[in-house]
UniProtKB/Swiss-Prot annotation:
Protein family (similarity comment): Belongs to the bacterial ribosomal protein bL9 family.
Gene name of this polypeptide: rplI
Gene3D superfamilies the record matches: Ribosomal protein L9, C-terminal domain, Ribosomal protein L9, N-terminal domain
Any GO MF annotation of the entry: rRNA binding
Pfam families membership: Ribosomal_L9_C, Ribosomal_L9_N
Protein name as it appears in the record: Large ribosomal subunit protein bL9
Amino acid sequence: MKLILIKPVKKLGKIMDIVDVANGFGRNYLLPRNYAIRATNANLEIVKSTVQQLNEKNQKGIDAAQAVMQKIDRSFITFICQTSDDGKLFGSITAKEIIKKLQISSDIKAYIDIKPIKTAGIHEVEVSLHAEVHCKIFINVARSNTEAQEYLKKFNAALQNTNNNVLVEKN
């Protein structure tokens, strides 16, 4: 299926790119979410005339995502969960729970591509706020607040040993 992208899509293309994708991906993902339109001659003419507006809209999205990134980049989010003695969680922490705890405004749709976190400790997670804007956050999973502080101290000590900047909890 040939489509014209009207929003940038990670690992697929930018605005105005004509892409050939699987029928299911186009019908079930790109078209319903308004990331693309069918590549017909009429649609190509329409997109060429509105490319300026699309680029401005894309730039506004990038600016909003960068503003959010400034707030959350390299921040810590602490989850207090029940764990077994060997540090395995009873359950897991999913991307949906992380996004909910980030409390990002509804204008920005954050995307986190991770497997559920099932162990205690500090985990690094990449957050995509826009196709072109990404940041890293740290998930601190512990049984109690004191254990979370211990993990943070160990993490900061490890960073000092590698000559990186010391991170402090932003929550």
